[in-house]
Each structure stands twice: as C-alpha cells, then as structure tokens.
Amino acid sequence: MNVRLIVFCVASIAAAGDLSGLYPAAKLAAEKPRFDKRLNELLGIFENATNAILLPEERARLQGVQLVFPLLGAGGDPMDYHSAGQIITLPVESLLFFEDLCTAYAWLWQNHYRMEVIEDYVTMLRYRGPDAFPGERYPPPLVALRIPPTAWDDRQVNDLSLRFRNSAFAFILGHELAHIYYRHPVQRPTTEASRRYEEEADAFALELMRRSATIPMGAMLFFEVSTYYLPNLAQGRSIEKEAGHPLNAHRLQAIASQLEQNASDYARLSPTKTTEIALVKFIAAGFQKFARDLNDPEFQKAIVAHALKLDAADLAKR
C-alpha cells in the first residue's frame, strides 16, 4: 500500500462522501414519528422529578429544551447530533443508522459471527466512494452486512438490540443536555476548550445513567463506531478543534475511569448484579482499548490501508 496515499486519506478524513442517500427520504419520513415519540419519552423520564435523574437545579436550567428531528444531518453525516440554545437536533438518518447497527451487532453476536465486519463497513463509508458498493450507492447497515429482515424475530436478538439502542440514545441525549446545561458555545474557541466541553458532556451523560442504574452498553458501541468514523486526534489538532464531537484518547480514558469507579452503581438494580458489574468493567476496558487505538498512529494508518483493500462482498463474510 502506498504510504503517501495512506497519509493523504488519514489527513482528509473530514472529506468523507455524502451519505445522505443511505435511506430513501420516504423511509426517513416514515420513521420520524417513531423516533420523535421515543426520544421525547426518554427526555420526559429525565425531566420527571420523581425519577430523581436530573437534580432540581439541573431541571431548572434545562427547562424548555426541545428536540427536533430533521430527516438528515449536516452534509448527510450519519453520526450527526448537536445542540444550540435550548434545541437538540437529532437527525432521523443518524438515529436509524445507529439503530440498524445495534440490530446488526446483536444478530452477529447471537449467531457467533465475525463482529469485525461492522468496523469494516464503517471504515468503508469513511474512506471509500459509493463506487465501492453495488449500484454505486452507499448501502445502509442491514443491507451492507446482509442482516436478514427477520432478525428481530429472534427474541434474544431483539432484546439485545434494544438494550444497545436505548442506552445509546440515553447517552446521546444526556450528552447534548450537558452542552445546554453548561452553556457550551457552538463555536469552539480552542482545541483544549473543545476537549473540555466533550469530557464534561460525557461525564454528565454517564452521571445521569448512573443515577438511573442504566448500564451504558450502547455508548460502547457508539464510540466503537466513532473510533472508526469520526475525526480524531490522529488526523491533526485543527481537525479535532473543528469537529463537532472530537475524539481523543484522554476523553475515552475519562469515560473508562468513570465507569470503573461506579461499576456497582450502574448495576445496582440488576437481579444478576455480579454479572452486570463485570459487564460494566468490560465496557470500561473497551474504552481503554479505543483510547490506545486513537493514540497509535500506525493503527490509524492500518485502518485506512485495510479500508482501501476491502470489497463490499467482504462485509457478508461470516
């Protein structure tokens, strides 16, 4: 593999293809009411005083927060979630994309298939053009990974998928609520400020999940996908500053530390508490691995090299 080509691809990560065509507009429009209902229900759970998830001062400052659901994110980015003022923007494409990844992950896991194909798919979206796929179109996760349309009929797949999805949506919503609560500016003045804002938002979201005894399984999958898709420190400090939700090793290590320190709290309501504590610690170890990967320039180059060698047919290999 040409080293110059690899370095060029790493440097130009922010210029990924337009993924706004992942799903037909009619599909997104049909799914919008479902996501609107689910995310607003989740916001209501956070806001309900009897649940004691948001503290009184937090509820007061977050009063009037509204959720909006455009069909597409900026530039067709399927990982786009953001907030400004008292409004949190949750594009339907982004929500459906991640929900489909949760279904794919659960089905592959339940059938003891190769999990790495999810990372392969995400890296192909980031580093390859639509001509790398059949019909010269970027395919949605369930199509690209050949997940059967009956996957949800398996109760264990359904339950695991929903557990990933619901906990991820709770983390994403909590993260965006934090940006509003702390009044983080949309425009990041410095790289250091951007890092601080993201770490504060992560900590706030995880604290809400700790208070509600929700194990952040979906957050692990979200950041696993992000490690392979979103701009990070390996692509340079300027890109990290400009990214809406930049990744760096310190941010992921902070998440791991918070999970390790509060493992028993996240699992306190589980009837199998010992098993669930072990799960939280497993998730924390996963974040430590993601941090090591982000700190390894050779790993970042290897991601690009691997993506450039992949064929769409490889995504169906079990």
Whereabouts are the PLM-identified features?
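C-terminal capping/extension segments of zinc metalloprotease domains
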Residues: 16-87, 91-97, 144-146, 154-161, ...
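Long alpha-helical scaffolds
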Residues: 3, 79, 128-130, 219-220
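Hydrophobic h-region of N-terminal signal peptides that target proteins for export
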Residues: 9-16
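Short alpha-helix carrying the canonical HExxH Zn2+-binding catalytic motif
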Residues: 164-178
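Mixed-charge, low-complexity intrinsically disordered segments
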Residues: 96-162
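Sec-dependent signal peptide recognition
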Residues: 2-8
